[in-house]
Amino acid sequence: MGLDPSISAIRGLQASLALDGVTVSVSPGMCYLPNTARIQSDGTASVTLSGATANTFYHLYAYDAGGGAMALELSTTAPDAPYLGTARCKTGDPTRRYLITGRTNASGVFRPGRHTRPAEMGNRVMLDAASSAGSLPLTILSGLTATTVQTIDLSALLPVTATRAIVQALNPSTFTLYTSRSAVSAPSPTNYQYVAIPGSSPVLDVTLDANRQFTVLLSATTILGGVIALLTGSVTLTLVGYEFDR
């Protein structure tokens, strides 16, 4: 007999971070556990991170606090492989349903962001400035002038559940930047997912491989096949958000 597909369902449960940078709550909604138990949130449950380790992933889990009422837990234990579809539980504990992941900074608080698209697949998080005083986006590649394929590894910044990185490509150079997923052939003027032409700064939804990596190539060859003789300027990539499944 096949698995009941309802045990992977999740509705609502949009995560939000308080101004203190350590208190997390979720909006009204519900989710199922593998044993078919349904737990519901009325929007009042929250959890506060205490004694946090800097620069560490913390994963938010929902569990049944009694009578189907939802409670929340933050843990450094990563989610297990999906048990059905994209639904995951805490590794070693099927009573905890995975909701979202945050990463602490050097001060032991979460970098703020907006969980803008809650769902089972394709959840989107847009990262905010790191403090009320403002900050620059996270730079993941700076001053690129090399014309060889570069692998961008985001495993230290994005959770294991991440499927796409939302990247701004700042290309004031005279060359063209091509991007690709690491699991397929290297990017080139004839094989790419996205392109940033000279003088452009597009925002790209870059597909990640299973290791949370993607590849880029800065090339003298344009998308029309022409060749630029001289490189001036360089390319910078910044991380502005990501998508994940749950």
Residue ranges of model-derived segments:
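Glycine-rich, compositionally biased intrinsically disordered regions
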Residues: G2-D80, T116, D153, F175
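Beta-rich globular "head" domains
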Residues: M30-L33, A52-D64, P112-Q193, T236-D245
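Beta-strand-rich interaction surfaces with strong enrichment in secreted/lumenal proteins
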Residues: V47-S50, L138-L141, V203-D205, G226-V227
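Exposed aromatic-hydrophobic patches
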Residues: T48, Q150-A156, G199-D209
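Glycine-rich strand-loop-strand elements at beta-sheet edges
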Residues: A183-Q213
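Extracellular carbohydrate recognition
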Residues: V227-T238
